[in-house]
Amino acid sequence: MSYKVNSSYPDSIPPTEQPYMASQYKQDLQSNIAMATNSEQQRQQQQQQQQQQQQQQQWINQPTAENSDLKEKMNCKNTLNEYIFDFLTKSSLKNTAAAFAQDAHLDRDKGQNPIDGPKSKENNGNQNTFSKVVDTPQGFLYEWWQIFWDIFNTSSSRGGSEFAQQYYQLVLQEQRQEQIYRSLAVHAARLQHDAERRGEYSNEDIDPMHLAAMMLGNPMAPAVQMRNVNMNPIPIPMVGNPIVNNFSIPPYNNANPTTGATAVAPTAPPSGDFTNVGPTQNRSQNVTGWPVYNYPMQPTTENPVGNPCNNNTTNNTTNNKSPVNQPKSLKTMHSTDKPNNVPTSKSTRSRSATSKAKGKVKAGLVAKRRRKNNTATVSAGSTNAGSPNITTPGSTTSEPAMVGSRVNKTPRSDIATNFRNQAIIFGEEDIYSNSKSSPSLDGASPSALVSKQPTKVRKNTKKASTSAFPVESANKLGGNSVVTGKKRSPPNTRVSRRKSTPSVILNADATKDENNMLRTFSNTTAPNIHSAPPTKTANSLPFPGINLGSFNKPAVSSPLSSVTESCFDPESGKIAGKNGPKRAVNSKVSASSPLSIATPPSGDAQKQRSSKVPGNVVIKPPHGFSTTNLNITLKSSKIITSQNNTVSQELPNGGNILEAQVGNDSRSSKGNRNTLSTSEEKKPSSNNQGYDFDALKNPSSLLFPNQAYASNNRTPNENSNVTDETSASTNNGDNDNTLIQPSSNVGTTLGPQQTSTYENQNVHSQNLKFGNIGMVEDQGPDYDLNLLDTNENDFNFINWEG
């Protein structure tokens, strides 16, 4: 009996009469499930296939002629070929255009009939779609290339036309503005994020432009727009913005007398307008909220005018006093406020040739005795604190010493004072004529030496180079010593440390004349005007005819510095310093001075000198002096003129002005002292100007229009020394060491036992100053003084300035 499953009851249990077969039932169930799943998968696959087929059909069936832009991009090379063909056609290159159209598969009739719109043609089975070509006279490709190349040159800094440069600048400006906008937007977003993180953000809308204007200080509306205009218009502070921050910190000092020192007034709320904060406030009144300070380097002073003592406001209260500096810590504000007589702490940096040779000379017993006898007492002077004075033995007055101290970088305002001081020295009595009676000339008194302050070792030697001048001396014609200075190029490796110009002073006092010593020291007590590189200044002297010269170069070391701080003994022919004799000076040994002060000859030569043998002195200026002023004080008894009187043409014709001033000089005691001699002026004959002087009974008339004359035979009390009218020396004739001793200009009283060999001589000293003599461009002038009836003792002092 077979079992037949009912279709309506698939899960029915068969009757018990038929046996149950489990395996068969299981197979039937699996087959049913498989059929169901297969049908579902087939259904899904069919749907997917249908969708794919639909998409493919849509892509295939989509019309390509409707989207022209996409077609141009897909056919970009065809478009370029079209413009190339158009350019070749309009450039009259027909053969080239035909060959190019054939190779590029283009329609040859296209160049003749420009296409107005897209068309499709079939050529050899290939579909070629042509886009519209812009019609231009020379071809669109050519014009496009011109614009492109112009802008490319402008952007690459290779030139370009003016229009291209303007266009490029506009493009750059737009790019910069966009960059600013983007940076401000990022900054505003960061501020908003910080405010939200701190819980201070209330959905405000921050405009980046307003924020940028507020940060730049421009007056604009607040950057934060308020939601309700009726609420309190106080902006919400944001920590990220440093300008909007408001910290309620009390000020350092509140100098408000009405509210008190401890009261703090409320400050105005911050806003975007910052124009009325600083400039409109009164600086003479205290501003609440601004700290009040004083400069720590300035003392507190009461200022009734109301000028501010600091950068904020004036401190007029007593509860805020800054510490006051002690007077020793106060500094000079300007260099011109320094007085002229203030001594400087720096000593001289220069050392003469004789002082450098101190360590090489062994001081013997004789040198020690001379140093013991010749030591002068140095005392601080009252007229010039920068240079001490020398007290000569036997004299109660002090003389200015040649010390090493100098004023560095003399201000421009002090030059006039220095000129006036020099004018007083050149115009009035000799500064060394105020000493009282000295011992007689028979008693041997040593010459005063100059004590020098110890110098400091300096490491910096980059100064002006020293010029070396070898001097050759020779005795000619019975004692006529002619010395010429030869210039030698200075070495580049050695640099001089001296910048001041020394003076050479001969026969300055009685003791020097007595011992036949030649001593050098400064001729003025004012600071040296050559300490700093001077400039051309106007003449400040009371004499309009005097020309001090134009200082065009920095002062260099004078070759006369080798004689500085030493004494010359004409008897022994040696230079003696503080430590004894230094070196011998004779005709074979050259000295480093261009000024030849010849040694007095002995024996017959001295007798010839005493018997009025004419002498000649050739003076050459130092190397490097652009304008040289020569100051000579002659103590000659009598000056005889020579035959060829030549005077430089650079001497001004201002003799009448000087004559009127000198003629009214109250210091003169004679009627014919102030007569000027200007009739001997002639044109110069050569570069070396020779200056010869007339034979004058009264030497005071020995003046040129630009020379300063000063009477040196008077005391500071305007009392004439009558004893100076006589000669101060005797000539025995048989003594080789006997010299012609002119009278001293320091007021020495002569005894009755001293008789004069020349009774007709007038022994008044002459102070001559030659300014701008013999100046030739690019040539150093030489001064040839043909002096007759004079010797080396007639030169009181010779000073180079320039």
From Swiss-Prot:
Compositional bias ranges of the Low complexity kind: 41-58, 310-320, 344-356
GO biological process: regulation of biosynthetic process
Domain LisH: 76-108
Chief location category: nucleus
GO cellular component, one term: nucleus
Chain intervals for the UniProt region annotation (Disordered): 1-20, 28-71, 104-130, 258-409, 434-506, 566-625, 647-757
Localization per Swiss-Prot or TrEMBL: Nucleus
Transmembrane segments: none
Compositionally biased region (Basic residues): 357-373, 485-500
Keyword field: Activator, Nucleus, Transcription, Transcription regulation
PROSITE patterns: LISH
Function comment: Required for diploid filamentous growth, haploid invasive growth and flocculation. Putative transcriptional activator of FLO1.
Similarity comment text for this entry: Belongs to the FLO8 family.
UniProt protein name: Transcriptional activator FLO8
Protein source organism: Saccharomyces cerevisiae (strain JAY291)
Gene name per UniProt: FLO8
